[in-house]
Amino acid sequence: MCQSLPPMKKISLFCMLGLLLGVSCSKEKVKPPAMTDDTVAVFGDDAFGAFCLRTYDRNGDGVLTVGEIKNVVSLDFDDKDIRSLDGIEYFTGLQSLYCNQSAGGNLVRLDVSRNAELRTLCCAGNKLEELVVDGLRNLSRVDCAANNLEKLDLQNLPVLTFLLCRNNRLCNLDFSETPGLKSIDCANNGISALDVRPCGDITMIWCEGNAGMRISLDWRQAPGIFGDDDVVLEVAGDENLVFADAAVAGGVVQRGVLRDDLHAAVLLHMVLSLQRGGV
């Protein structure tokens, strides 16, 4: 017959359960606290903090609050020696962020996922290994060229139209949640396959420097495609699609261009495969 535990053992057991539950809960992702106008902005980089304080401390008290910077719509840190933009989330009304570095910047990580109003992001020429932009439903232009990115999450970016990510270390790009994308420059990466069929308005793709890349697209959606000599292009279109080379086109169709007005797909020195009914 089972006997009940002595009172002290019961207390110890409940304490252990509480500790276990506490550990379990601590692993869950905690949402950041809501910001008010009185929230003090804290920056992870002295140069970044000094710039913001010097520029936006309106009452001169040496403290920067969200109320003082919430209406800032554009920030330009091009060619400034800033190593971290931690604290950028305090700029809740930010629409444009420029932190390009022509001489090679120092940013290794950039998270703008809490800047919900952001429309334009230019962060080329840094040392970025991580760029967090997913979920920005107003973001339309991203230039993150010449960094060290091995992955780029493009989830939930419904109005993104322009993506420049050449000269990184990317192996894959998923465009399933970027239906408005019109221009892609992903040259000089390590991408082996590119599926742009979810992008109904695509007009330009620059993809040179990705050896053996296979592109999947609907030719009727792509009036201009610039590729490389070792690219395989898979085209899904109607059965009357005509293939021509530059000589036949008389120079109107240029090398590496898919021209909708001529109903012709031209990729000189490339393998061109047409799979009826889709790819």
What is each stretch, according to the model?
Residues 1-32:
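Bacterial Sec-dependent N-terminal signal peptides
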Residues 4-5, 22-24, 150, 229, ...:
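Short, low-complexity, intrinsically disordered N-terminal modules
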Residues 17, 25-105, 116, 137, ...:
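N-terminal capping/linker segments that flank leucine-rich repeat
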Residues 75, 97-100, 119-123, 142-144, ...:
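Conserved hydrophobic beta-strand positions in leucine-rich repeat
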Residues 80, 102-105, 126, 147, ...:
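Consensus "Asn ladder" position of solenoid repeat domains
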Residues 85-88, 107-112, 131, 152-154, ...:
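Canonical leucine-rich repeat
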Residues 171, 176-213:
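Ankyrin-repeat and related helical/solenoid repeat scaffolds used for protein-protein interactions
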Residues 229, 239-240, 246, 255, ...:
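Alpha-helix boundary/capping motif
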